[in-house]
Every structure is written in C-alpha cells, then in structure tokens.
UniProtKB/Swiss-Prot annotation:
InterPro entries: Ribosomal_bS6, Ribosomal_bS6_CS, Ribosomal_bS6_sf, Ribosomal_S6_plastid/chlpt, Transl_elong_EF1B/ribsomal_bS6. It comes from Prochlorococcus marinus (strain MIT 9313). The keyword rRNA-binding applies. PROSITE patterns: RIBOSOMAL_S6. Binds together with bS18 to 16S ribosomal RNA. The keyword Aminoacyl-tRNA synthetase does not apply. Keywords: Ribonucleoprotein, Ribosomal protein, RNA-binding, rRNA-binding. This is Small ribosomal subunit protein bS6. Residues 99-124 are annotated as: Disordered.
Length: 124
C-alpha cells in the first residue's frame, strides 16, 4: 500500500503589487487547491527576494510556498490559474513521495515551558 504523494508549489509574484493584493493571491490559490479536493498542508510567505536573473524586467520577486496533498488534479487547476495571472512571474510544482512532512511550528506561537515557569516564579 503506497502513501498518497504530496506536492510543493513555489510561485513568485511581481514585487510591485501591494501587500493586500499579495494576500488576495495567496488566499485565492489556497482556496483553489481546497476546492479541487486536496488538502493544504502548509503555506509560507518567503518574502521579497532578489531573483537570480531578471524575469519580465523584474530583479526581485515575492516568493510563496504552498504544500498540499491530493490526487494530482489540483495541480493542473492551480498551474492554469497561475499561467493566466499577470502577477505570477514564475511557478513550479514538485511531486514528493514518502511520508508527509511534520507540521511546522512557528517560533513564538507557543510559549516555552521554561518561560511559563519563570513567569510563575516572578509572580510568586
């Protein structure tokens, strides 16, 4: 019995679009994957970075990584939407075999047990 593959899609948005529009694109692509019957595992904003070479006269781009699993049909839907978008300057989807990656814990999202103990000691 083989495990269901998961996919990682990295896409680069134009650097000159406003932050609200970036969030709109991220939400749109995440919902597209969900509507296609797949599950979004992780969505990371990598931020604005310098490109290795100019793409469409841009030297920088806003990088976004989307990890998802499903039967593969969501990839065609997602890539078609990205291909037609003028705000996406590059995209790449890679199929990963094997176990799903562990969920990413964002630093600062959960208090450390040591910090809780120190806070209790200060209050006492």
């Amino acid at each position: 019995m083989s495990q269901q593959p998961y996919y990682e899609t990295m896409y680069i948005l134009r650097p000159d679009i406003p932050e609200e529009e970036v969030e709109t694109h991220v939400t749109k692509y995440r919902e597209m994957v969900t509507e296609a019957g797949a599950e979004v595992l992780d969505n990371q904003m990598r931020g604005k970075r310098r490109l290795a070479y100019p793409i469409s006269n841009h030297k920088e781009g806003i990088y976004v990584q989307l990890s998802h699993n499903g039967n593969g049909q969501q990839v065609a839907v997602l890539e078609k939407a990205m291909r037609l978008s003028e705000d996406v300057i590059r995209y790449l989807t890679v199929k990963q075999e094997g176990p799903l990656p562990a969920p990413r814990i964002v630093p600062g999202s959960e208090p450390e047990p040591v910090q809780q103990q120190e806070a209790a000691a200060v209050e006492a």
